[in-house]
Design a protein with these regions (language model features):
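Surface-exposed loops/turns
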Residues: 16, 26-27, 160
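Long, low-complexity intrinsically disordered regions enriched in Ser/Thr, Asp/Glu, Pro/Gly
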Residues: 60-62
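Short, surface-exposed beta-strand/beta-hairpin micro-motifs centered on an aromatic residue
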Residues: 10-11, 17-24
Length: 349
């Protein structure tokens, strides 16, 4: 439970009856997020006949819980299934170059196979969701989300504990920005027209653009950035497209994505010291019950949003935390190096 729009949190564990008790709360407006992981063996034995399944994630959220006196209430949880391929790191803040000028072409996204099985990336897409100032599809939120940009992963097999690194520009950014990083190690590059490119790095196909002029990895430096992984075996250009009400035909058209197709999602909202604007949240609780932020609203801080480590298996394979609750699963770190999971701030507490 957090005071609405902040990161001041209170935690409680439910008893056998599913009751959680919070004591000594200050009168305020709170956001309540609940997460529970039901192991696959336990879930498989709960249904008849027993089945083989991944871990089941139970999540729920109450974003505007007003507590000014003793409160008793119930929260219905939504069920999701833990996925193999997940977001592990998202770097969008940018930094400063050697002349102290804004530098944000070093953005990257990292994916990770969090399972013990090899997975295929066939028909898997990455979508950046719309972030209009006024939410306009609240009533559809449980069934649909809307994408402004969609990228399609080339088909490949990804072994357990391995990553995919996607760069906005797969170049050595430390040449111009000493505080940045070398992204020549990227697996894929979003090759924008008339922008520096690395011919040695494979292109990540940009299969849908809400605006033709936005042909790069279009993450907002300070946030928000809402990202989802989803699987679709057709052409995403054939999916339903909608505009914000009262928009002109020349304005952005967004692709409608059924939430049932989503494999993983992360809400990176814009930081605000007074109150984080939760109206910008786009995903239902079963995809992301909360959010994560940078430490400032303006970005250029050289910070990334990175998933915590849950445990390390005997064979050395890192298992990342995944409860579909970004406040619990991710941290904001000033160590922006990709592909590294030994950072102290990522370790189990």
């Amino acid at each position: 439970m957090t005071i609405r729009g902040s990161k001041n949190s209170y935690k409680a564990v439910t008893d056998e009856e599913g009751v959680a008790v919070f004591q000594d709360l200050l009168p305020d407006v709170y956001s309540l997020a609940v997460s529970y992981v039901l192991p696959r063996e336990e879930y498989g034995n709960m249904v008849n006949p027993p089945i083989e399944a991944n871990d089941v994630l139970l999540n729920g959220t109450l974003p505007n819980l007003r507590i000014y006196e003793n409160y008793n209430g119930e929260l219905t949880l939504q069920m999701g299934v833990r996925q193999s391929l997940i977001f592990s790191k998202i770097y969008y803040s940018g930094t400063k170059n050697a002349n102290n000028k804004n530098y944000d072409v070093d953005q990257y996204i990292e994916l990770y196979n969090n399972s013990d099985q090899t997975v295929s990336t066939e028909n898997i897409h990455i979508a950046l969701l719309e972030t209009e100032s006024t939410p306009w599809f609240v009533e559809e939120k449980e069934q649909y989300i809307y994408a402004k940009d969609i990228f399609k992963l080339p088909t490949r097999d990804l072994e357990p504990g391995k990553s995919i690194l996607i760069a906005r520009q797969a170049i050595d950014h430390t040449i111009d920005a000493p505080l940045s990083l070398d992204l020549t190690i990227a697996d894929y590059e979003v090759k924008a027209v008339n922008k520096p490119q690395n011919s040695q790095v494979e292109q990540l196909p940009h299969v849908y653009k809400s605006l033709a002029t936005l042909d790069w990895l279009n993450m907002v430096v300070g946030g928000g950035n809402q990202l989802v992984l989803f699987r679709y075996d057709g052409d995403v250009n054939d999916l339903t497209k909608k505009q914000k009400p009262d928009a002109k035909p020349s304005h952005a058209w967004y692709v409608q994505i059924a939430t049932s197709m989503v494999l993983d999602g992360v809400e990176c909202l814009k930081y605000n010291a007074q109150e984080i604007d939760l109206s910008k949240k786009r995903m239902p609780a079963r995809i992301d019950a909360s959010y994560q932020t940078l430490s400032t609203a303006s970005g250029r801080t050289g910070e990334s949003i990175e998933r915590k480590v849950a445990r390390v298996e005997e064979d050395g394979r890192v298992v990342l935390q995944d409860t579909n609750n970004s406040l619990e699963d991710f941290v904001c770190t000033s160590d922006i190096r990709p592909l590294i999971y030994t950072k102290p701030e990522l370790q189990p507490q």
